[in-house]
A protein has these predicted regions:
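Alpha-helical subdomain
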Residues: 2-141
């Protein structure tokens, strides 16, 4: 989104990383800039149904082909395989319902995200656990 570039650029500059990052706005349904070391999707896939998720991931894969060793990081809430009556699971369930009603998407488990990545011909290599309901799935070609 174009309006997200300015605050992101300011934060990157504050961290002294401007020479290491390029921020590009656009649609992930169109061709993505090719040849980057890293591609990042945060809270994107849960907005969409499986077919749209695979299209987005295929666009990432297409862009990654230009750079051997390129990685994709997918940051999303990771739903449990079986929900329990915990505050964490309840928060994920509420978000899941919100995604379904408002956007037609849903929260998914790590297994479900790995399946979407595989369908897009990407291989999930690891899950970087975060101290929250979010996880960071790392994927390669």
């Amino acid at each position: 989104l174009p309006h997200a570039i300015e605050p992101a650029a300011a934060q990157i500059a504050r961290l002294g990383l401007s020479s290491r990052c390029e921020l590009v706005s656009g649609s992930f349904f169109d061709n993505l800039p090719a040849g980057a070391d890293v591609y990042l999707l945060k809270s994107v896939l849960h907005d969409w149904d499986d077919a749209h998720c695979v299209r987005i991931l295929q666009r990432c894969r297409q862009a990654m082909l230009e750079r051997p060793g390129a990685r994709l990081f997918v940051i999303e809430r990771l739903a449990p395989e079986h929900f329990a009556a915990t505050p964490r699971d309840r928060a994920i369930a509420r978000s899941d319902l919100n995604m379904l009603v408002s956007l037609g998407g849903r929260e998914r488990s790590e297994r479900e995200y790995r399946a979407l990545l595989a369908e897009a011909a990407l291989r999930a290599t690891r899950n970087h656990a975060l101290p929250s309901e979010y996880g960071v799935l790392e994927a390669v070609l």
